[in-house]
Structure formats: C-alpha cells, structure tokens
Amino acid sequence: MQKILYLHAGAEMYGADKVLLELIKGLEKDAFEAHVILPNDGVLVSALEKVGAKVKVIDYPILRRKYFNPKGILEYFGSYNRYSKQIAKYAKGNGITLIHNNTTAVLEGIYFKRKLKLPLIWHVHEIIVKPKAISDFINFLMGRYADTIVTVSNAVANHVKQSRFVKNDQVQVIYNGVDNAVYHEMDASAVRDQFGIAQDALVIGMVGRVNAWKGQGDFLEAVTPILKANPKAVAFLAGSAFEGEEWRVDDLEKAISDSPVAGQIKRIDYYSKTTELYNMFDIFVLPSTNPDPLPTVVLESMACGKPVIGYRHGGVCEMVKEGENGLLATPNQPAELSKAIQELADNTEKREQFGKASVKRQKELFSLQSYIRNFSELYKKY
C-alpha cells in the first residue's frame, strides 16, 4: 500500500482545495492511504477527514509575498527548518512512502526528498510569470528535486518547460475533473428568490477569489454598459480574499457602490453551495488578468450547463472552444470582453446551445473519473 503525504497551502474550499479533496475521496482505499498536513485549520480539515484522510495541522510556512524581503527570507527559512523536522518525524512515524506537493507555494517536500529519500510528485496549479526571480527559483527547485511534475493543463506544462532547469520528460499533464453528482443542472428559481433576483432577470455571474488577478475590476467594467442598457440584467459576484488581504474586498465593495448601476450588482463572500450559483447564472464570466492555469470554477460552471466567457490565455483556452461553448476576448481588454458578454446577452438560443456544449465538453475532457485514474496510475509507478 502506498502511504501518501499531501502537503497543501491552506484549508479553505477554493479550486486547488477542492481538487485535492476530490482526489483523496476517489482513491482506492485498499491501495492508497492519504495523510494530509495543512498549515492552518479550516473547512478543508473536516472535509478531508470525512473522506478518510488522516489530517494534521502544523503551522509550516507557505511561500507568500510577505517573505520577499531580507527579514522575511530569514523568517521563512527559520520556520521551514523547524517545521520540516516536525513533519519528517510524522512521515517516519507513519511509514510514508510518497510525497505529493499540492502547490508551488509549498517547498517542504524538498526536505523529505533529501532527508528521507522519498519520491516527490510536485502538482503545479499555477502559472508564475512575475516576479521572474521567484518563477526561476521555483522551476529550479522542481527541476532538481521532483520525480514527476504534474501540471493541470498544457498551458502550465508549456510554461514550466520553458525553464532551462526542467526536463521535458519530468512533466506530465493531468487535467482536473469535477464531480457531476455535485455539479449538474438544476432548477434555480428558489436560489433567485433567496438573493432577491427576478425570475426573468438576465444574470451575469462570476465566482472566484478576490485577489490581484482574478479580474473583478474588469468584470465590473465589462458588465456596466450591459446593465445600463438592460434594467432587468443583474451582475453577481461571489468570493472572498486571502487572510490579510481583506482590503481587496473593501476596494471591490467601494467600486460597486460607486458604480452608476450599483443597484443591479450583487456581491457575496465565499458560498459553499456553488452549484446553486452557477445554475442561477445565465452567463458565467471569469476574466483573469493573468493566465489562469485551469480554473476549477470554469469546469464547475460548464458541468452546470453554462456558456463561459473569459480572456484568451492560460488553461481557459483548453476548456472553452470558442464559438462552441463560450467566447474569449483579448486579455485585459474589458471593452472586448463586454462585447462578448453582450453577444450572449442578446441571444437566448446561443446561450442554451453553448450551455449544452459545455456539459458535453466537461464530461468528455474533464471528468472526475479520468482525473483520479490518471493519478492512481502515476502513484503506482512509485
């Protein structure tokens, strides 16, 4: 039996968190034993325990911007050494046979590769472009220490392979999958009532972390002319910020309140029943201003039968087939994004056609079953 130690960067329930949960939930319990160490407590802890994982919280450092200064570097490496020793003790005590680093922000897997001689799978959910020094540093570490670098899309794989530190045969693409038992089409009339949205309203929705690059600002700029022209249209945003970055939500709330169509814009924090939200939307929009590796929210909205609009970069280009299940705009061009939204806002038939194609494409290319099978086969190689 493979005893796998998963190292992850948080305990919330966003994209990479959900992907980890679904993987562990789907693994054969007689072939794999999942151990997860998280840097903090949160909703993910109990969710993982419910699917059979052994979970421990140890306050190990996650590579964040706050460490990108001389004082921060010293603080990071002091914590890194101290907590890595604790995790190594856990790994030895529990007979761990394989390490799965679930993000580039977690570097502790290197310690166990070096000290315990355990194979290391590095699961890359990010496309890190800036700062270039950090991108080069992480690629160097992955190239030197990872036995296999798993990327969530070809966009991520191509980015990683550009590094002189990474060998092509180190990299394997495994698409994330979503559970169609959870994400599926459903009647959303009660959800609209819950949020005070008319049944005949056109709802343009966005779900995503409020951070520097998910594109909430571009979303607001793009939907404003559409809301002005259609008093029955509603823009709906859902998502929270990282701890310590709550000011981003304050800025977003101010932008909404200052908008000339503020009465047609609704925003909520993280919402656990996202299936309800997707089904309430007529159009799903994710205008990430940096290349998004393979945004889980896009897959979830596709599974719920929604047309998708986004920017033409990153993994979205592999999820959305333009003119078939969605439309893409030139990155960081809100006016062009607005035209794409308007095209679907004006055409009910096209929205329905794209929505059906979204479900078909998600089931064919991004199924949960293929995601779990591909990882199981990789684990068995070690």
Which residues does each predicted region cover?
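Short, structured helix-loop element that forms part of the nucleotide-activated donor/catalytic region
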Residues: 43-49, 236-262, 350
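Conserved acidic donor-binding segment of nucleotide-sugar-dependent glycosyltransferases
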Residues: 322-323, 327-334, 343-349
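Short hydrophobic beta-strand element within catalytic cores of glycosyltransferases
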Residues: 307-310, 320
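Active-site donor-binding acidic/aromatic loop of nucleotide-activated sugar
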Residues: 244-249, 261-271, 277, 327-328
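Acidic anion/phosphate-binding donor-loop and adjacent secondary structure
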Residues: 29, 158-163, 169-170, 177-194, ...
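A short, well-ordered alpha-helix in the C-terminal region of glycosyltransferases
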Residues: 190-193, 336, 343, 350-365, ...
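Acidic donor-binding loop of glycosyltransferase active sites
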Residues: 96-97, 279-293, 306
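A conserved mid-protein helix/loop that constitutes part of the nucleotide-sugar donor-binding site
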Residues: 17-22, 202, 206, 211-225, ...
